[in-house]
């Protein structure tokens, strides 16, 4: 067996770039106050998580009418991936989120010149996980693996999927969701070649009527 763990933290930092060509110029900036990254690699798979605070993204070009200027309070992303072949189900997952994402007013007015839509902070969080059987070792990048697996780029068989959390809010609306399904990989006839799902997802959407009215008045609909 083997076990590798790692983590690091970075203080305030930024990346700036500036490109020029006969067609115009492009310049931008990526920055954050601090970030943290952790990872582990074991027989149970690869786990990776990253977090950053007070992020900033700017992009301008001679061919863009308005510069892109976006900031957010914090963000995170991560994943869990099995890497070794096993006949029993293994965990996989994906995690994404950010809070207080703000689009600069100049850019927002380009999208909504009449100011009918609320340019407030955008928040999002999603956590998705599941269980799957890995039919080949992912660390063995052999072309015949994919040929033997009907050209499936990743030879795996999903048994269960869980939407642990979905939380999205923007422009006065919100969407929450959760749920799970089990997949019957023996039944490929009910859904024409796809495993039969058994389970359900539940979603709650609020504030959408007011948003639709504003989209209509803005000419988007």
Residue ranges and their predicted role:
Residues 1-221:
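Glycine-rich, small/hydroxylated-residue low-complexity segments
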């Amino acid at each position: 067996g083997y076990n590798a763990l790692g983590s690091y933290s970075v203080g305030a930092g930024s990346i700036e770039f500036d490109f020029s060509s006969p067609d115009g110029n492009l310049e931008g900036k990526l920055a954050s106050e601090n970030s943290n990254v952790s990872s582990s690699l074991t027989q149970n798979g690869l786990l990776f998580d990253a977090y950053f605070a007070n992020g900033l993204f700017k992009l301008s070009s001679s061919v863009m009418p308005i510069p892109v200027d976006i900031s957010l309070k914090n963000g995170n992303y991560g994943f869990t991936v099995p890497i070794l072949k096993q006949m029993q189900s293994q965990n996989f997952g994906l995690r994404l989120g950010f809070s207080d994402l703000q689009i600069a007013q100049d850019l927002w007015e380009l999208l909504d010149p009449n100011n009918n839509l609320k340019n407030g902070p955008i928040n999002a969080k999603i956590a998705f996980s599941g269980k799957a059987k890995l039919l080949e070792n992912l660390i063995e990048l052999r072309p015949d693996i994919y040929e033997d697996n009907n050209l499936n780029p990743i030879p795996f068989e999903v048994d269960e999927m869980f939407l642990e959390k979905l939380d999205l809010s923007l422009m006065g609306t919100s969407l929450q969701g959760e749920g799970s399904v089990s997949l019957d990989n023996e039944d490929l006839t009910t859904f024409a070649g796809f495993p039969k799902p058994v389970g359900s997802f539940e979603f709650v959407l609020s504030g959408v009527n007011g948003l639709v009215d504003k989209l209509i008045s803005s000419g988007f609909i």
